[in-house]
Amino acid sequence: MKITHITTYRLPPRWMFLKIETDEGVVGWGEPVIESRARTVEAAVHEFADYLIGKDPARINDLWQVMYRAGFYRGGPIMMSAIAGIDQALWDIKGKVLNAPVWQLMGGLVRDKIKAYSWVGGDRPADVIDGIEKLRGIGFDTFKLNGCEEMGVIDNSRAVDAAVNTVAQIREAFGSEIEFGLDFHGRVSAPMAKVLIKELEPYRPLFIEEPVLAEQAEYYPRLAAQTHIPIAAGERMFSRFEFKRVLDAGGLAILQPDLSHAGGITECYKIAGMAEAYDVALAPHCPLGPIALAACLHIDFVSRNAVFQEQSMGIHYNKGAELLDFVKNKEDFSMDGGFFKPLTKPGLGVDIDEARVIELSKSAPDWRNPLWRHADGSVAEW
């Protein structure tokens, strides 16, 4: 079997799919994207195609190494996201050829189900509480919400009070009936993170995500030393070599590699194993589409340290398409009591509606994250 063609499709709301075709008619799907940089990743995918056309798709490890090492310059969000989507599609092909789901090819299940959590948007506490109530009605009891808006390097007590007030009202409304993580999106400086974490402790969030940027990862162990709240990060780390440094330094309780950013299934399975060796939990980052989610689930079901799975149903970014709009076998992604079950169809287990993909790719928007500025006009972290 040989790879004959690679096609990319930019899609709403902010996704990109790729299709790898073979001379025997077997097709694999992947999801390579950096949100707001889809065209750049798309160009990288087609550059990598030079290494792939005419090659045997079964040699996933060799093709991965060729893409990673053959160009001398390597790593980073663009190239690792391109590799990630290609890698997903290669595993999809392998599973279809062998008539087995990817988790079966990786040694089989370590669990029967994995808890899902849902994003909750809203700028005011009442909106967040209303969003949680609606999601509880369809079975969710675990959530993630933004921890704060933009925050200055040294900000005032009003900014701290606003962040804490939202969390306090949520805990008052629901008590211990729900769990929630707080995503700070790297918006907070190390000095302000210390203040916020101390103020949030009484409300027992499930985790705090990206309290500081990955570029300031040296602060993770320092922040962890002053709190009992688990600290999570990893969506902006792109290889096992980056994760190696933070695992060795300590501080993170939960790793969040993104299967569409960090080299795909092949790389993230290695990252999961590294995390287990350090007694660190795994919770793959996934505010993206169905192929990315499927890839995450296959890792979850073969990794003992996986604890819960992010998914994008109803997320505030989903304008123009929802999580399963491009999927024919929607029933396979249904949740029972807020848990996903293993995908059982061969390969990734996603039956893509190719006609719909082609149609909506003709008018896909170039999604950009907002540009935020502080009151003084300086650029803020989004």
UniProtKB/Swiss-Prot annotation:
<dbReference type="GO" id="GO:0009063">
    <property type="term" value="P:amino acid catabolic process"/>
</dbReference>
<feature type="binding site">
    <location>
        <position position="209"/>
    </location>
    <ligand>
        <name>Mg(2+)</name>
    </ligand>
</feature>
<comment type="similarity">
    <text>Belongs to the mandelate racemase/muconate lactonizing enzyme family. GalD subfamily.</text>
</comment>
<feature type="active site" description="Proton acceptor">
    <location>
        <position position="285"/>
    </location>
</feature>
<keyword id="KW-0460">Magnesium</keyword>
<dbReference type="Pfam" id="PF13378">
    <property type="entry name" value="MR_MLE_C"/>
</dbReference>
<dbReference type="InterPro" id="IPR013341">
    <property type="entry name" value="Mandelate_racemase_N_dom"/>
</dbReference>
<dbReference type="GO" id="GO:0008869">
    <property type="term" value="F:galactonate dehydratase activity"/>
</dbReference>
<feature type="binding site">
    <location>
        <position position="183"/>
    </location>
    <ligand>
        <name>Mg(2+)</name>
    </ligand>
</feature>
<dbReference type="InterPro" id="IPR029065">
    <property type="entry name" value="Enolase_C-like"/>
</dbReference>
<dbReference type="InterPro" id="IPR018110">
    <property type="entry name" value="Mandel_Rmase/mucon_lact_enz_CS"/>
</dbReference>
<dbReference type="InterPro" id="IPR036849">
    <property type="entry name" value="Enolase-like_C_sf"/>
</dbReference>
<comment type="pathway">
    <text>Carbohydrate acid metabolism; D-galactonate degradation; D-glyceraldehyde 3-phosphate and pyruvate from D-galactonate: step 1/3.</text>
</comment>
<dbReference type="InterPro" id="IPR023592">
    <property type="entry name" value="Galactonate_deHydtase"/>
</dbReference>
<keyword id="KW-0479">Metal-binding</keyword>
<comment type="function">
    <text>Catalyzes the dehydration of D-galactonate to 2-keto-3-deoxy-D-galactonate.</text>
</comment>
<feature type="binding site">
    <location>
        <position position="235"/>
    </location>
    <ligand>
        <name>Mg(2+)</name>
    </ligand>
</feature>
<feature type="active site" description="Proton donor">
    <location>
        <position position="185"/>
    </location>
</feature>
<keyword id="KW-0456">Lyase</keyword>
<feature type="site" description="Transition state stabilizer">
    <location>
        <position position="310"/>
    </location>
</feature>
<dbReference type="Pfam" id="PF02746">
    <property type="entry name" value="MR_MLE_N"/>
</dbReference>
<feature type="site" description="Increases basicity of active site His">
    <location>
        <position position="258"/>
    </location>
</feature>
<dbReference type="GO" id="GO:0000287">
    <property type="term" value="F:magnesium ion binding"/>
</dbReference>
<dbReference type="InterPro" id="IPR013342">
    <property type="entry name" value="Mandelate_racemase_C"/>
</dbReference>
<dbReference type="InterPro" id="IPR034593">
    <property type="entry name" value="DgoD-like"/>
</dbReference>
<dbReference type="GO" id="GO:0034194">
    <property type="term" value="P:D-galactonate catabolic process"/>
</dbReference>
<protein>
    <recommendedName>
        <fullName>D-galactonate dehydratase</fullName>
        <ecNumber>4.2.1.6</ecNumber>
    </recommendedName>
</protein>
<dbReference type="InterPro" id="IPR029017">
    <property type="entry name" value="Enolase-like_N"/>
</dbReference>
